[in-house]
Amino acid sequence: NWNLLQSIFKNKRNFYGNPYKKHSDLEINTFIDEFKVENQSTKFILKNNKPNIVFILLESWSADNIESLNGLNGITPNFKNLENNGLLFSNFFSNGWTSDQAMTSIFSSFPVFPYVSIINQTDKARKLPCINKSLREEGYHSSYYFGGQLTYGNIKSYLYTQEFNIIKDEKDFNNLPSGKLGVHDEYMFDVFHSELNKLPEPFMSTLFTLSSHSPFDFPGEHKISFNHREDEYVNSVAYTDK
């Protein structure tokens, strides 16, 4: 009964018609054409056909914290070092505004809708395609690590239905220093590094950070002064970068 009532409450605005605006065919085609790229422009930058793949999902980070993306100077110097040894995509925009929306965008390439989150509709979410399943067909092992509670936003359910081999969250790291939301990032990075050395190859492994989420109770220094309102957030990003 609870699931039925919850579903009705979350979708009641759709009972009165389509809540989305309809664009003309010309507008739609013009938008889609921007994504068309000739195949010969693709460059293969790896030497290994089956490299290990590591995703580090940075909680609440934005271009405002990254100097090369017209952000403030000095907040993320270590990220800047990574830019010099990799590729930085500058024409990239957020797919949503909550963590649960991000998961289905990142792993299932599913767009975010304004009023509903598909991850909370398990019967639909389990039918989504997933990079994890595609890589598994190529012999990949998959894992996901988070220092907080993956029950938030129904993320754990989504990861299970997408058949990740290893899923670990706060309860698996209860011996590590923690704040109100979970294990501090510096300790999770250490654990993650250790776990990577144990995984069967090739693998796809993900770490979702936490310390740059409110209430920003990380154990690092608060030495960056931006403005009173944003100081805690900016310093939390600097902490994760460090």
Roles of regions detected by a PLM:
Residues 1-242:
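Soluble catalytic regions of membrane-associated enzymes that act on cell-envelope
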